Amino acid sequence: MTCVTGGFYDEKCYFEISGHACRENDGEYGMPTELDGGEPLACAAVSVLVMTALEKVRALDSDGAFSSASVTVEPGYACFDLETREEYADEVRHAFEFILLGFELLEENYPECVSVA
């Protein structure tokens, strides 16, 4: 199960994505051997959303949007802890609201794989 938590607090943006949308198979997390329960789709979609968020943060960071930015992305875990400059606050909020919408749609369609708190 992938769990998504976080939100916006003034100019602060914090999101944490943890866990795997796929069950464990043969000692490793990854693509299940059978297409059951939508797991392969949910797993791939979670990966795409995390990588999209990462690329958006990189682009915004190169524009000087953050006064501080801490980003961790590793297998089964991603954390975005961003302090946004006031003039970029709306752009950052809209970007992460869009990505959060993607996670909410996954939760709606694959509740056994994704949870948004």
Residue ranges and their predicted role:
Residues M1-L41, E55-A117:
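N-terminal intrinsically disordered, cationic/polar leader segments
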Residues A44:
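A short, polar/charged loop-to-alpha-helix boundary motif
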